[in-house]
């Protein structure tokens, strides 16, 4: 398991989520990671933000984190430098002048992860045969299906528990590329929630942060950590 965070020397207005993901994807593809717009995520990333004291409706970015539980991606992510981020962000108008990379801070609670996924989460009903419909309500069935999906992906049981924080939003997620630049879009959900695991399985939270939730999540899975000041780092 690898988790890193690039801390800025000063907060900046938080760019949009696509810009942040593009910065990391560009840096990784330059280092030989193939672009994979389909299949389960192999790595995760997170934007660390907090409210602007002068403009409460605006958020400031203090750090950009990344991680993976995949050995191949761990090795490449371990060598990602501020210079690489600066090169890939140049055209986006983002500068990382005196940023530094360090091991990511531990989760604020060992058995709880309070996050807002950027990447839509797709889990499917278990049916005997035929096409499996997506579950678009955050309920007990969704949690059961999520643990089943993660167990299938990573080859071991999962014991995640979800507590909804806000109403979910159904959305459409691109899951694969087709010839002539066509894409297949399937439904998933995004929501703010508290993700828990029993104390004896608390390591599962770090695993899903670095591996994404659900299936068909594309190249990387994104999280927003809102309301964090620089203090925890």
Label each PLM-derived region with a short phrase.
Residues 1-233:
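RNA-interacting cores
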């Amino acid at each position: 398991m690898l988790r890193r965070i690039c801390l800025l020397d000063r907060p900046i207005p938080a760019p949009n989520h696509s810009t942040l993901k593009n910065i990391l994807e560009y840096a990784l593809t330059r280092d030989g990671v193939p672009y994979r717009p389909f299949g389960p995520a192999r790595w995760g990333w997170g934007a660390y933000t907090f409210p602007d004291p002068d403009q409460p409706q605006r958020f400031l970015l203090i750090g950009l984190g990344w991680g993976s539980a995949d050995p191949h991606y761990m090795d490449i992510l371990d060598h990602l430098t501020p210079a690489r981020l600066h090169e890939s962000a140049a055209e986006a108008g983002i500068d990382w002048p005196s940023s530094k990379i360090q091991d990511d801070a531990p989760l604020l609670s060992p058995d709880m992860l309070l996050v807002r996924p950027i990447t839509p989460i797709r889990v499917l009903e278990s049916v005997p045969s035929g096409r499996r419909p997506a579950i678009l309500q955050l309920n007990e069935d969704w949690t059961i299906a999520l643990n089943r999906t993660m167990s299938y992906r990573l080859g071991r049981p999962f014991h995640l528990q979800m507590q909804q924080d806000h109403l979910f939003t159904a959305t459409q997620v691109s899951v694969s590329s087709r010839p002539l630049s066509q894409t297949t879009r399937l439904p998933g959900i995004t929501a703010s929630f508290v993700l828990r695991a029993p104390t004896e399985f608390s390591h599962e939270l770090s695993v899903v942060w670095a591996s994404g939730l659900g299936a068909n999540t594309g190249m990387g899975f994104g999280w927003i950590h809102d309301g964090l000041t620089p203090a925890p780092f």
